[in-house]
Regions:
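Active-site-proximal loop/helix segments of hydrolase catalytic cores
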Residues: 138-202
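Zn-dependent metallo-beta-lactamase
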Residues: 1-28, 32-37, 42, 203, ...
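Active-site environment of divalent metal-dependent phosphoester hydrolases
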Residues: 15, 35-36, 66-72, 91-95, ...
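Beta-strand-turn-beta hairpins that frame and shape the catalytic cleft
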Residues: 2-9, 21-27, 117-126, 157-163
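Pre-active-site segment of Zn-dependent metallo-hydrolases
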Residues: 3, 17-62, 66, 71-75, ...
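Binuclear metal-ion centers of metallo-dependent hydrolases, dominated by the metallo-beta-lactamase
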Residues: 102-119, 176, 199, 203-246
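Active-site HxH/HxHxD metal-binding segment of metal-dependent hydrolases
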Residues: 47-118, 123-134
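Active-site neighborhood of phospho(di)ester-bond hydrolases with catalytic His/Asp-centered motifs
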Residues: 29-31, 57-67, 85-88, 164-167, ...
């Protein structure tokens, strides 16, 4: 499903993949993994269907961290002259999956650090903190699953709208300081903020629209999206679910 918001067309394509179109400019966030863009994802949950996606139309592709680095998916969404924005800490050499190196990606690769800004064809890109707190629920063996510095979130300024994808992160104090038009929170049951934290943040940010992503792709990401939508709507914040019915 494509959601029309202001001058944007927004589609959740599964897992953390989002396509954002404004006029002749197309951006993708964290494309791929788990068969969502190869047609191999065949889950029965409330989630976009897996498709053999090969548009190669993206002007901008943004990757938050190693867990969302999928070189095949980047090639499927990026045009030949795309700008591929990779967070500095992304390192294919330490990824225990079959991925190509950065030198084999299409287009121009730009490495971007924490709290940095970049502009591609008039679209502003800002990195934001994204991590799990050591004393929070998303730890393994006493260590955060996503330690500070491992990944980032992105705030895109596109067509006058400010689109916020927090990445794989708990709700952080820095998030509450943002001016956001379109909020794309994870609402999964592990690894990131859950639906309750995401709803609290949505109420505080008071965006024009909330579209949750990064849930129901596999068992550990299961979430009650209908309950999230009811919670957010009950707080007076517009929300849309971009998913196939279970």
């Amino acid at each position: 499903m494509t959601i029309r918001y202001d001058d944007l067309s927004v589609s959740w394509l599964g897992y953390a993949t989002v396509r954002i179109e404004h006029e002749d400019f197309i951006a993708y966030l964290d494309p791929g993994r788990y068969g969502t863009l190869t047609g191999d994802w065949d889950g029965e949950t409330a989630h976009p269907p897996g498709t053999d996606y090969d548009a190669r139309d993206g002007d901008l592709v943004c990757i938050t961290h190693d867990h969302h680095y999928d070189s095949d998916a980047i090639a499927r969404v990026a045009s030949d002259d795309a700008t591929i924005v990779l967070y500095d800490a992304v390192d294919p050499a330490r990824i225990d999956r079959d991925v190509d190196g950065i030198e084999d990606l299409p287009g121009e690769v730009v490495r971007i650090g924490a709290h940095e800004e970049y502009v591609v064809e008039g679209v502003g890109i800002e990195t934001l903190p994204a991590y799990n707190r050591p004393d929070g629920p998303n730890t393994s063996g006493g260590e955060p699953i996503h330690p500070e510095g491992f990944g980032c979130g992105y705030l895109l300024d596109i067509g006058g709208s400010r689109v916020f994808w927090p990445g794989d992160s708990d709700v952080l104090d820095a998030h509450y300081e943002l001016a956001v038009s379109l909020f794309l929170p994870s609402i999964s049951s592990s690894f990131t903020m859950d639906r309750h934290g995401a709803a609290d943040l949505a109420e505080s940010l008071d965006p024009d629209l909330v579209v949750p992503i990064h849930y129901n792709t596999f068992e550990a990401l299961e979430a009650d999206s209908a309950a999230f939508a009811a919670d957010v709507a009950g707080r007076g914040v517009p929300v849309i679910l971009d998913e196939r019915s279970s």
